[in-house]
Each structure stands twice: as C-alpha cells, then as structure tokens.
Amino acid sequence: MTEALPFWKTKHLTELTREEWESLCDGCGRCCLHKLRDEETEELAFTNVSCRLLDTQSCRCTSYATRFRKVPDCISLTPALVAEIDWLPPSCAYRIVLNGKDLPWWHPLVSGDPETVHQAGISVRGRAIDEREAGPLEDYIVSWPGRFPRPRRPRQEPAGKTADES
C-alpha cells in the first residue's frame, strides 16, 4: 500500500486548510524581526530586533489571537502576500512550498519535533533583541535573517553508545 504524500507536496498554498496553513510555520521567528527599507533605493535591511510580542526563547507570538490589535502593522500572511512580499526569509516554509520545494529536515512537520528548528540554528532564539530593549533599528542591521541558513544537524551518538557513555 502506498503512503499518501504530505499536504505540502500535493497542495498549492491557496488549497490549504487553516490548520495546514498554520502548521507550515516552523516557529523560527525570523518574520517577526524588524526590517528597514531605504526610501531612495528600496533596498531591504534586516535587523535582529524582534516585535515586542515575540517570545525570543520559544520564538512564538505571545498574543497571536490579538496581535493585530496590539501591533497594528503586524502582517497577516496570505498566499497572495507570500507571492508578493520580498521580506520573508528564504527559509520560510510558505516561500519554500510556494516555489514547489520540499520542506527541510529541521521543519517540525518533517522532524516531528518543534525543537529541531532551534537545534539546527534556524530560529532567532539567542539572536534576537526585544524592541523594548533596543535602540535605533539602524544600529541592529544584520544579514543572517535574509540568507538561507546552513543548518547544523543535531549531534547523534554512534550506534550502540549512549550519551552517558560518551
């Protein structure tokens, strides 16, 4: 008997259920970092300053259901917006699926573990600064959120050896 392919391999973003759409978010928090755009050149610059609602440890929104009331410029991603905007990180699952690619090994839908996005060094955990603690955004410009990361695989012990024996 053939196993059914996962939804992200068989459906377009516009065909996803609400649950499928929400599960595509890997919880990296990169989209919740402030971005700057040069008014003359339109060049985009990423910062490591996070929205005040982002829990920089879990990399999840602390007020997801009410975020638009608390942060009026928070964006509600839609399939149309994913296709239009240029500031989603290249590692964003919405972008990856839109481009017909498979999700990476560290994505929780592939790994079965929401911690792999952090273990692989994809998330903003340990790298983001809360906007309430930051100074001028121009002082926090970084390039890493705009690059596809080279994820590090979690260390695995050799077969037959336990972590205690290492």
Swiss-Prot record:
Residues spanning the signal sequence: none
Sections of the chain in a coiled coil: none
Pfam family, one: CxxCxxCC
Annotated segments matching region Disordered: 147-166
Biased composition (Basic and acidic residues): 154-166
UniProt record similarity statement: Belongs to the UPF0260 family.
Name this polypeptide is given: UPF0260 protein GbCGDNIH1_2046
Organism: Granulibacter bethesdensis (strain ATCC BAA-1260 / CGDNIH1)
